[in-house]
Amino acid sequence: MSSFARVAVLISGGGTNLQAIIDRLAAGELPHVELALVVSSRKNAGGLDKAERAGIKHIYIGKENFEQELIALLEEHEIDIVVLAGFLKILSSDFVSRYPDRIINVHPSLIPSFCGDGFYGLRVHEAALEYGVKVTGATVHFVNEVTDGGKIIAQRAVDIKDGDTPEILQRRVMEEAEWKLLPAAVEKVAAEIVARRG
């Protein structure tokens, strides 16, 4: 039996959360994770360069037949866990139901606050500042048919400071929460999958 869970990371942009996983892997902190594949929904996503530099198989899939091609790739590479890391496409309920408790997303707020339809990227941080909350953070959760509605795996809080702009807050949430939380959550789920194999 394999002592690794094979992981695919789905990206649409610069790949900062992908890089956090790559860095933790290189540091030996993810002993049950094999990063087998990076898939981008955008041709020029910076995350593809990060995968290239790390020697990880990477591919761009265009809009046409995206999910069918993705499913074929995941099966070909025997993927156990799918990680959404700055991935901006909405996956269909048919796709999500194929991989119960195997798709992981990181969201830049403490769910159930500032989540769901329309809350992504900078908009999440704008909403937190507009509302006047004193604490925000990040959540890693399983993906189900409800946007940001799956079971929570881990959360980390981040203080909001006087003078924060959405951009400053976004950066702090990434550095203090997302980049720490996501790799640890992927390792946790991977270890559970390996343990279930016996």
Model-derived features with residue positions:
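One-carbon transfer enzymes
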Residues: 1-198
